[in-house]
């Protein structure tokens, strides 16, 4: 059974001006160091908190790569949760589970014309290797069984429900279109992601 091992206060966001708490865990399925970032003590004060399961993306989250919209989705969620409260489950699942170096190899294939899924397949991987059991374990450690899920990804909805978490509402993020990620976003939409390109 997973438990919270530590709870640390810190300031987050692009300007480091948003108060939050970062939680670490013990007893998860693997030894990956997933964390929860909690805003406005949502785990203590909200019966159905806003939750985003955000898979680590070094290139997008840290270096603001033009290849994806991960950093923009993360920042949008931080800003939303700074006002309404919520929990980001930051999961160490780089490259939809294939790892950083393999993702960089996939980037090279994308530069040659493949889309993000074709590149992963060419390297011998499935479209999405992520499993969200540990996300469910983290929520259970916080005594949370019902959430409002921030996602555009139907796989996340299905997977977290399969692990016993009830979804009260699905909240979409914006389609953060910029030079360099249009093909990537349209590939995701073709694979079922709910993206509104009109906004």
Swiss-Prot record:
<feature type="binding site">
    <location>
        <position position="68"/>
    </location>
    <ligand>
        <name>Zn(2+)</name>
    </ligand>
</feature>
<dbReference type="InterPro" id="IPR000926">
    <property type="entry name" value="RibA"/>
</dbReference>
<feature type="binding site">
    <location>
        <position position="73"/>
    </location>
    <ligand>
        <name>GTP</name>
    </ligand>
</feature>
<dbReference type="GO" id="GO:0003935">
    <property type="term" value="F:GTP cyclohydrolase II activity"/>
</dbReference>
<keyword id="KW-0547">Nucleotide-binding</keyword>
<keyword id="KW-0479">Metal-binding</keyword>
<dbReference type="GO" id="GO:0009231">
    <property type="term" value="P:riboflavin biosynthetic process"/>
</dbReference>
<keyword id="KW-0686">Riboflavin biosynthesis</keyword>
<dbReference type="InterPro" id="IPR032677">
    <property type="entry name" value="GTP_cyclohydro_II"/>
</dbReference>
<feature type="binding site">
    <location>
        <position position="116"/>
    </location>
    <ligand>
        <name>GTP</name>
    </ligand>
</feature>
<feature type="active site" description="Proton acceptor">
    <location>
        <position position="128"/>
    </location>
</feature>
<feature type="binding site">
    <location>
        <position position="156"/>
    </location>
    <ligand>
        <name>GTP</name>
    </ligand>
</feature>
<feature type="binding site">
    <location>
        <position position="57"/>
    </location>
    <ligand>
        <name>Zn(2+)</name>
    </ligand>
</feature>
<dbReference type="GO" id="GO:0008270">
    <property type="term" value="F:zinc ion binding"/>
</dbReference>
<feature type="binding site">
    <location>
        <begin position="52"/>
        <end position="56"/>
    </location>
    <ligand>
        <name>GTP</name>
    </ligand>
</feature>
<feature type="binding site">
    <location>
        <position position="70"/>
    </location>
    <ligand>
        <name>Zn(2+)</name>
    </ligand>
</feature>
<dbReference type="GO" id="GO:0005829">
    <property type="term" value="C:cytosol"/>
</dbReference>
<dbReference type="InterPro" id="IPR036144">
    <property type="entry name" value="RibA-like_sf"/>
</dbReference>
<feature type="binding site">
    <location>
        <begin position="94"/>
        <end position="96"/>
    </location>
    <ligand>
        <name>GTP</name>
    </ligand>
</feature>
<comment type="pathway">
    <text>Cofactor biosynthesis; riboflavin biosynthesis; 5-amino-6-(D-ribitylamino)uracil from GTP: step 1/4.</text>
</comment>
<keyword id="KW-0378">Hydrolase</keyword>
<feature type="active site" description="Nucleophile">
    <location>
        <position position="130"/>
    </location>
</feature>
<dbReference type="GO" id="GO:0005525">
    <property type="term" value="F:GTP binding"/>
</dbReference>
<comment type="similarity">
    <text>Belongs to the GTP cyclohydrolase II family.</text>
</comment>
<feature type="binding site">
    <location>
        <position position="151"/>
    </location>
    <ligand>
        <name>GTP</name>
    </ligand>
</feature>
<keyword id="KW-0862">Zinc</keyword>
<comment type="function">
    <text>Catalyzes the conversion of GTP to 2,5-diamino-6-ribosylamino-4(3H)-pyrimidinone 5'-phosphate (DARP), formate and pyrophosphate.</text>
</comment>
<protein>
    <recommendedName>
        <fullName>GTP cyclohydrolase-2</fullName>
        <ecNumber>3.5.4.25</ecNumber>
    </recommendedName>
</protein>
<keyword id="KW-0342">GTP-binding</keyword>
<dbReference type="Pfam" id="PF00925">
    <property type="entry name" value="GTP_cyclohydro2"/>
</dbReference>
